[in-house]
Amino acid sequence: MSSNAPRHTALDALHRSLGATMTDFAGWDMPLRYGSERDEHLAVRSKAGLFDLSHMGEITVTGPGAAALLNYALVGNIASVGVGRARYTMICRADGGILDDLIVYRLQEQTYLVVANASNAQVVLDALTERAGGFDAVVRDDRDAYALIAVQGPESPGILKSLTDADLDGLKYYAGLPGTVAGVPALIARTGYTGEDGFELFVDPADAEKLWQALTEAGAPAGLVPCGLSCRDTLRLEAGMPLYGHELSTSLTPFDAGLGRVVKFEKEGDFVGREALTEAAALAEKNPPRVLVGLIAEGRRVPRAGYPVVVGGEVIGEVTSGAPSPTLGRPIAMAYVDAAHAAPGTAGVGVDIRGSHEPYEVVALPFYRRQK
């Protein structure tokens, strides 16, 4: 296979049989939408949606020194994560630049599952492997060992309960437990990227189609629909969740992104980027260069990544993500803007959309927060 040929998930034929529009995403052929991305988005907000996320990058870290390695390699306090729990964290360069944002699951006392973004999986694998020197731990590429299926939305707990004996009521947000779903062995994690309650199911690729079909049948009465990456992007945008390559990059630190809370300076020992991030934290507190904010359009024109944010003809920031919001019924965006213009309600802010000044309201993120 040539290096340019896209990879296919275990559900590729099934997506095509459902009439999915496919797209190349991070070297994978993935479903963009099955019909209307707006309908898929609203189904997740009100009922439930089913996603194939098998392009994500799973990396297993095992051994007596696994916790110490991850505490050194990542910015979070991974050693403090209990067995069966998960943590959102980041891996940074020595200069503090973000290599990726991650979720780390502690499966056993000496076993962790690191889940990287598809576009950065190899970068994260290489960094962890390089940083493992001197630690009694093994870093293993498990990208081919898992298919990942997510069911997201307010109806997702009921749908999943009908297919498993696992204690879903006792499964907290950012927790995971082994179980079986429709007879399929799975890691059942209460995580997601939509702003809704939901579950991510890590299974053997050979079982993926069986599990997808079982979830489809069990979810039909509740209004579950298959969902593509297009609505996943608008869902995470409404929820104010960052996307690597847009809100996060190697040119930004976690503090630049307003996510300094993931950096745990109080943990024992050194970690990659500690010195640079200490400086970044001090700068962010005294004089932040730019701040990540939400923007809501007063009109109908949609901003895209890279469009300038302006006040009185002066560029004061840049859009990182933008789309029509199915929930709000108006275009929305995330943008980095100068701190002086970052307060909600700041007057005169607009986006330069192909030479036209379009007025936008500055708001605090997220745009949408589910009722719990």
Curated annotation (Swiss-Prot):
<dbReference type="GO" id="GO:0004047">
    <property type="term" value="F:aminomethyltransferase activity"/>
</dbReference>
<dbReference type="InterPro" id="IPR022903">
    <property type="entry name" value="GCS_T_bac"/>
</dbReference>
<comment type="function">
    <text>The glycine cleavage system catalyzes the degradation of glycine.</text>
</comment>
<comment type="similarity">
    <text>Belongs to the GcvT family.</text>
</comment>
<dbReference type="InterPro" id="IPR027266">
    <property type="entry name" value="TrmE/GcvT_dom1"/>
</dbReference>
<dbReference type="Pfam" id="PF01571">
    <property type="entry name" value="GCV_T"/>
</dbReference>
<dbReference type="InterPro" id="IPR028896">
    <property type="entry name" value="GcvT/YgfZ/DmdA"/>
</dbReference>
<dbReference type="InterPro" id="IPR006222">
    <property type="entry name" value="GCV_T_N"/>
</dbReference>
<keyword id="KW-0032">Aminotransferase</keyword>
<dbReference type="InterPro" id="IPR013977">
    <property type="entry name" value="GCST_C"/>
</dbReference>
<dbReference type="GO" id="GO:0008483">
    <property type="term" value="F:transaminase activity"/>
</dbReference>
<keyword id="KW-0808">Transferase</keyword>
<comment type="subunit">
    <text>The glycine cleavage system is composed of four proteins: P, T, L and H.</text>
</comment>
<protein>
    <recommendedName>
        <fullName>Aminomethyltransferase</fullName>
        <ecNumber>2.1.2.10</ecNumber>
    </recommendedName>
</protein>
<dbReference type="InterPro" id="IPR006223">
    <property type="entry name" value="GCS_T"/>
</dbReference>
<dbReference type="InterPro" id="IPR029043">
    <property type="entry name" value="GcvT/YgfZ_C"/>
</dbReference>
<dbReference type="GO" id="GO:0005960">
    <property type="term" value="C:glycine cleavage complex"/>
</dbReference>
<dbReference type="GO" id="GO:0019464">
    <property type="term" value="P:glycine decarboxylation via glycine cleavage system"/>
</dbReference>
<dbReference type="GO" id="GO:0005829">
    <property type="term" value="C:cytosol"/>
</dbReference>
<dbReference type="Pfam" id="PF08669">
    <property type="entry name" value="GCV_T_C"/>
</dbReference>
